[in-house]
Each structure stands twice: as C-alpha cells, then as structure tokens.
Design a protein with these regions (language model features):
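N-terminal Rossmann/SDR dinucleotide-binding element
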Residues: 1-85, 95
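Active-site helix adjacent to the Tyr-X3-Lys
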Residues: 4, 104, 162-163, 167
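Short, well-ordered alpha-helices that flank and scaffold nucleotide-derived cofactor binding pockets
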Residues: 7-11, 111-114, 170-173
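Conserved Rossmann-fold NAD(P)-dependent oxidoreductase catalytic core, especially the SDR/UDP-sugar
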Residues: 76, 81-86, 92-100, 104-159, ...
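Conserved beta-loop-beta element that borders a ligand/cofactor-binding pocket
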Residues: 165-177
Length: 177
C-alpha cells in the first residue's frame, strides 16, 4: 500500500516526502524501500524524484520511532501531514505481534501527530466491518461507520485493526487529533 501511495504523491504533487522505513530480516531499510517500490513500479525511475524523497530508518514500535530527539523534532516541526499505512497485514499469527504493530505502533504515530499538531491520515482495512452483524445482518457498513454490532474478534489481524481505529477515533474526540 505504501508504495502505491508514494507513487501517487510523487506523480501528482510537488510535495517533499519523508518516509520512515524499518529494517526487516537484516535487510537495510533504504534497500528495502527501493526493492518494494521497484517491485510495483519497475519502469519508474526514483532518481527523478530523489530531491523530494527523504528516507529515514526508523521503527514505529520504538519511542520517537527510534530516531534521535533532534530528528524526531525536525520531522514534527517540518511536515504538514502524516499518512500511515504501517501495519502487520498477515491474517494469522500471535495476537501480541499484531497488537504491537497495529495498535501500539499506531498509538506512537498518534502521539506524534498530537504532540506536533499534525493531521493523521490512517489507512485501515475493510476487514473491520467484520464477518456480519450479530443482531441485524441487513445493515450496510460504510466508511462512516465504526462499530455497528459487527463480529470482528475471531481474527487477530481484524481485531488489532479495529482496536487501532478505536484508538484513533478516541484521539480525535479527546486529544484534538
């Protein structure tokens, strides 16, 4: 998802983009970034956009995204929106793994946005609509809905994304996110 969002931002705006990328399986974050982008857009030359892309090795699971205070503050004081598609997206595994990335990681992103008064654009999943409504199966679930009685707790991925959305909605209501 992130590569597609980046592509749209690069080709349809003039924005400067800061990408916080984590290392994975001992693969350098910058190398991983280029591999992912070129997988989806093999004919696109990122060098054409290098003056607008700032790649930052970080980790949303760590305090300050595992960045030095100065770099964290620089980001907070120099960006005008956050688009978060960070997520553990497999559908099976241990709930703790999903919680750490999809809920606790989202909490750290949310706290960053609140601290620096930056709008957050959060990418979720239609899966939060659940597997059907418990009491009234004929109700339609839309992007304006959150909890309408749907069943979502049987899948660890869906449950974690539901909890992340709940966290963000509460931050919007209580913390002026």
């Amino acid at each position: 998802m992130g590569s597609h969002i980046l592509y749209e931002l690069l080709t349809k705006t003039k924005s400067r983009i800061y990408c916080v990328i984590r290392e994975k399986d001992n693969i350098n974050a910058i190398e991983r970034f280029y591999e992912k982008f070129h997988f989806y857009f093999p004919n696109e030359n990122l060098r054409n956009y290098s003056h607008r892309i700032n790649l930052i090795t970080g980790n949303i699971l760590k305090d300050n995204f595992n960045l030095p205070d100065e770099q964290y503050d620089f980001l907070g004081n120099n960006i005008n929106c956050v688009i978060s598609s960070a997520a553990l997206v497999k559908h099976y595994g241990k709930y703790e793994e999903f919680y750490n990335t999809n809920v606790a990681g989202t909490k750290k992103i949310t706290n960053f946005c609140i601290k620096y008064n930056i709008p957050l654009h959060y990418i979720s999943t239609i899966s939060v609509s659940g597997y059907g409504l418990v009491k009234s199966p004929e109700i339609t679930f839309t992007e304006k809905d959150f909890y309408i009685g749907q069943s979502y707790e049987d899948n660890v991925y869906v449950k974690s994304k539901f909890e992340a959305e709940k966290l963000i909605l509460n931050a919007c209501k209580n913390d002026n996110l």
